[in-house]
Amino acid sequence: MSLFLIGLGLTNALAGNTDASPKIINGEEATAEDYPMTGGMLMDAIFSFGGSGEQAIRTFVCSSTLIAPDVVLLAAHCIDPFAFTFGFGDLSDVDLRWSRMADLSDHDGTQIAAWPSDAIVAWDWVMHPSWDMEAMETGVAINNDIGLLFLDEPVLDVEPAYLLSVDEESQMVEGALVDVVGWGQQIATDFWEAPPAGSYGYKMMGTSSIDELGTHEFHVGADSEDVRKCHGDSGGPSFMAVESESIEPMRLVGVTSHAYDNSDCNETGGVDTRVSVFADWIEAEMIARCDDGTRAWCDEPGLLVAPTELPGGEDTGFIDGEDPAGGCACSSTSSNPMNGLAWLPFVFGWLGTRRRSVLRET
């Protein structure tokens, strides 16, 4: 099956492909201030070809979201070595970092560029224990494609994203609008084809909808005219506005995982992991690293709860229908979970797009 990841295979020179005429996948450009809790995960590593040499790599891998000052939520396949090697080699000296920069195009896999100026080292990362890339299913299924990064230092100037509470869960229904963010492809291409220059590695956002809702996953962007996620958007968020007593109505409800069917990014969009289903696992991993003293920030060891008032009880200053966040992922797929996962090109990176207004009249 195809994941929305772009890891290593862009060495066929993006710069040489200059046809940028096709329409982007229905999103709009975003800045670092739009959905400021979102970021890109980059990887530096040595890929060994099993006796046939080795190659140094440094590349953007996945989109992602800050859920605590030092914790980043993303897809499990973004940090699974098998997603890069497919068993044909090994990764060593792996260095993962997280950046909020809107332009990560220098890290498209064609060169070893300097780290982004704001890049923070991840000291630890973990995949869900039931994740198995070789057993992935297409459509809306149960794949457990979710993981965490733990940062060396906390990000204290950005409000993290909040997950759905138990009471808010019932608001997640088919037809609900979701805002998506990612650094992935803006133009759908064939699996082995590099995206046109200027159409990958830039932060994008847009509004789509939940078209099919399962117990553990949901489908986003069912039609070709919808905002759709693509390679590079893997790990990235889907946000949904909820009715709540909280002053922050935006909730992180999905993590971009994989394409819906064989049409890849071209027509039917992608599938997200439902975040709230895994809330207990996420919180347990967060608390465990506070209990053993390894986390960088433990003012609140577990999942953060959306505030009901500003510090000091001040009024929010926002009017009804205004977004207090300021505007806060497609892989190729197949009926055979591993069919189409050609080694190292476009595997990790679902990205979508998200508009500035999470709150709107519906």
Description of each model-found segment:
Residues 339-357:
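A cross-kingdom C-terminal cell-surface attachment/processing module
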Residues 358-362:
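Cytoplasmic C-terminal tails of single-pass
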Residues 60-108, 198-211, 229, 237-321:
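C-terminal subregion of chymotrypsin/trypsin-like serine protease catalytic domains
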Residues 33-67:
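Glycine-biased strand-turn-strand hairpin within the trypsin-fold
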Residues 6-35, 291-305, 309, 314-320, ...:
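Boundary/junction segments of secreted and surface-exposed precursor proteins
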Residues 18-33, 54-56, 84-157, 161-169, ...:
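Conserved catalytic-core segment of clan PA serine endopeptidases
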Residues 142-228, 275-280:
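Chymotrypsin/trypsin-fold serine protease catalytic domain
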Residues 322-339:
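Extracellular Ser/Thr-rich, low-complexity/disordered mucin-like segments
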